[in-house]
Every structure is written in C-alpha cells, then in structure tokens.
Amino acid sequence: AQDETASSVQSGNGANGTDGPAAGTSDVNAAEKSGAMKVKKVLCAPVAGEAAPITEASDEAFAGKMMGDGYIVRPEEGMVYAPEDAAVSFVFPSKHAVGLMSDDGVEYLIHVGVDTVNLNGEGFEAFVKDGDRVKKGDKLIGFDIEYIREHAKSDECIIVFTSLKEGEEIRLTKPGKAEKMDPAAEIVSFN
C-alpha cells in the first residue's frame, strides 16, 4: 500500500519524471558486457542489516520504482545514520522518513518501514530537523524495531533516489549482510 510518503515525494510518474518506465529498466548485462557502464557514486548503507534490491520491497509503489530506483535494508538495529555529508531536506512529522540532498546534488529518501506513516510517530525518534546539515555517520532516525515489526507491514528501510538522471540506475554491490556505512550500492550510468 502506498502511503503519504510516495505521493509527497513524487506524483506517481516514472523515476525520470515522465509517464514512461522508471529508471533502471535498461539491460544491465548488455551494458556491462559492452563496457558502457560508469560508476557515478558509491552509496553507503544507512542502517545495519540485509541489503536487497528495491524490487523486493514489501510496498508495491517502492518495488515498482514509482518514486525512483534504490535498494532496501532489512534492519538488524533501530538506528538510521547519515550515509554521507548532506542537507536534511525534510523529516516527516511522523518521523518515519527523512529526505536528504547530498553535497553533489543527489536527492534521496530514507523510509523506515512500510505503512509506518500510520503510526503517527509512535516508536520513532528524529535526531534531525528540516534544514539541518549532517555529517556521515550522524544519527538521523531512531526506531523501536520490535514495535515496528508488531504494528507495521514491514520494518524494512527503503532508500530511494528521486533525482536520478536519464540513463542512471542503482546497482546493489553488496547484497546480503551490510554493516552501517558499508558501501552497499552505486549510482551507475549507461550513457
């Protein structure tokens, strides 16, 4: 089920801002074989847990890349950290999601759990507010993992990139176990 976060971040268009398919639909194997792939940015896991492709998200809107490409982490602990130096674009009043803009202009959302907006902030603690500057490793959101597991559809943390350019996608480089701040994915370009 799509919660308010999805409609607040992007209005249901494809990740590239058109009505076409979402970013990340190119043939990765063909591009890799042709040598056309270029790594544009290494992405660190904001939470410890098991990293997986966004297509495995419990929420259909995220899994379908309606808001953009990304990845998920099934958390082992209830703390989300800043994966890099960035500006805090917004923190939802329900404290279940935070938007960041990196110093190099990449915008992304870190969303804790599925249908957690319905918890109205219960089980969450925000350590940042709109407009804050954060350094890599700073605490962003704390959450009671057991409470989330009991009261929400899923506790997975969804990291979705809302400003990818045409031809860019997220490639998971470390599926499976990821410690916080481990390189877990990359923004790659096939242009």
Task: Give short role names for the model-derived ranges.
Residues E4-N191:
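Contiguous, well-folded functional domains in the mature portion of proteins
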